[in-house]
Design a protein with these regions (language model features):
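Conserved helicase motor core of P-loop NTPases
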Residues: 11-40, 123-133, 138-299, 309
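Inter-Walker segment of RecA-like/P-loop motor cores
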Residues: 60-108
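C-terminal accessory regions
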Residues: 276-347
Length: 347
C-alpha cells in the first residue's frame, strides 16, 4: 500500500465517506470534486479508491489523449466520455450518428472517475449524471477555463483540494515549471529533461514546424501562425485542402464532434453554394470512421462572427488546427511548442 501524505489521506477519507453515504440517494450528492495541481496525486488516489469499491469502476476523460495517459497510469480500460455513454445509431462506419447509450457499461457501474473535468460542458455533464452513478471528477484549478462550453463540474467548489506536489512529480520538467509559474517566478532559459525554455531570438523554426501542436496566447497570433505553417507545408489558398489539420469549434453530438477535437481532411473539399462539404477523420480515432461535415468558408477567413446565428447554427464549425490558443488545447501530453506570441516561424 502506498504511503500517503496527510493531505492525501484526508482526501481519501472524504471520498470514502461520500461513497459510504450512497451518492445519488439521500443527502449525498452524485458528484465529488477532487481537485489538485499537476503532480499532487489525483490519479493515484482515484486508482486506490477504485480498488476498494465493490463493483465495476470506470475511468474516462474528455479527450483520447487524456484517456491514453490514464491507461498508462494504471487506470484500466480508460476511454473517452463519448465512447462510454454514446452509441452509433447504425453500423455505417463511414458516417455514424450517435445517441445516449442507456444500456452502456456506465449504466451498472458503481463509480465513474472523470479526468480533465474542466472540459465537460453542461450537456455532456447532464448526460453523465443521467445514469445516476456516483461521479468522482478530477480537475486542476490552475488550468485555464475553456473559451466556451466546459466548466460544468468546475463551477462548484472542490470537495477535496490537493496542493502538495509529490517529490517524485517535482522531477517532471512540466510539473517543475508549472510550480515556478504559480509561485510567480520567471522561467530561466535552459534544458529541463526533454523540455526546453528558450528566448524568442533563439527559437529554431524547425522545432516549431516539427511539433505535434503549437500553442499561443492570442487569436490574432493563432491565425497568423496557422497561415504560415500551412504555407510551409505547401497548402495554398485560404480554404482547407486534403491533408489539412482542423479543430472543431462547436459540439455536434449526433456526428460525434466535440469542441476542441482535431481532425484531418481526407478528401478534397467540395464547394457547393458557398458551403464546404468535407470528409474528416478524427485525429485520435483508431478506426476508419469518417465524418461528413458542411462548413461555411467564413470559418477559415475570420468572418464567421459576422454571420447571424440562425445562419451559422445549420452548419458545423471548424478552423485550422496547427496552432491553437492555450484555452483551446490544454493537453500537455504531446510533443509541442508553447509560444509566447512572438515571431517563431519565418515568413
Amino acid at each position: 500500500m502506498p504511503a500517503f501524505s496527510p493531505e492525501q489521506d484526508a482526501a481519501l477519507k472524504a471520498v470514502a465517506a461520500w461513497l459510504k453515504a450512497k451518492p445519488g440517494r439521500g443527502n449525498a450528492p452524485l458528484v465529488f470534486r477532487l481537485f489538485g495541481y499537476a503532480g499532487t496525486g489525483k490519479t493515484t488516489l482515484a486508482k486506490h479508491l477504485a480498488q476498494g469499491v465493490k463493483g465495476k469502476v470506470l475511468f474516462a476523460a474528455f479527450t483520447g489523449k487524456a484517456a491514453l495517459v490514464m491507461r498508462r497510469k494504471g487506470c484500466e480500460e480508460a476511454s473517452t466520455i463519448h465512447s462510454l455513454i454514446y452509441k452509433a445509431l447504425d453500423n455505417n462506419a463511414q458516417q455514424p450518428r450517435f445517441e445516449l447509450w442507456n444500456d452502456s457499461p456506465a449504466s451498472d457501474a458503481k463509480l465513474i472517475v472523470i479526468d480533465e473535468c474542466s472540459m465537460v460542458d453542461a450537456e455532456l455533464g447532464r448526460d453523465l449524471q443521467s445514469f445516476n452513478v456516483p461521479l468522482l471528477v478530477l480537475g486542476d484549478p490552475a488550468q485555464l477555463p475553456p473559451i466556451q462550453g466546459g466548466g460544468f463540474f468546475t463551477d462548484g467548489q472542490p470537495d477535496a483540494m490537493l496542493t502538495e506536489v509529490h517529490r517524485q512529480a517535482q522531477n517532471d520538467p512540466i510539473v517543475r515549471l508549472s510550480m515556478d509559474i504559480r509561485a510567480g517566478r520567471r522561467l530561466i532559459p535552459g534544458e529541463y529533461g526533454d523540455t526546453q525554455v528558450v528566448t524568442r531570438d533563439r527559437l529554431d523554426p524547425k522545432r516549431v514546424l516539427g511539433a505535434d501542436q503549437v500553442l499561443v496566447g492570442r487569436n490574432v497570433t493563432r491565425r497568423a501562425y496557422n497561415a504560415r505553417l500551412r504555407e510551409r507545408r505547401g497548402f495554398a489558398g485560404a480554404l482547407p485542402v486534403a491533408g489539412d489539420k482542423l479543430v472543431c469549434l462547436r459540439n455536434n453530438r449526433r456526428k460525434g464532434l466535440f469542441n476542441g477535437g482535431l481532425c484531418v481532411v481526407k478528401e478534397r473539399p467540395k464547394p457547393r453554394r458557398q458551403i464546404l462539404r468535407m470528409r474528416l477523420h478524427p485525429d485520435e480515432d483508431i478506426t476508419d470512421r469518417m465524418i461528413k461535415v458542411s462548413v461555411r468558408p467564413e470559418c477559415f477567413t475570420g468572418q464567421i462572427e459576422q454571420l447571424d446565428w440562425p445562419v451559422r447554427k445549420r452548419f458545423d464549425e471548424f478552423d485550422f488546427g496547427y496552432v491553437l490558443t492555450v484555452h483551446r488545447q490544454q493537453d500537455i501530453n504531446t510533443s509541442g511548442f508553447n509560444g509566447n506570441d512572438g515571431e517563431a516561424v519565418p515568413e
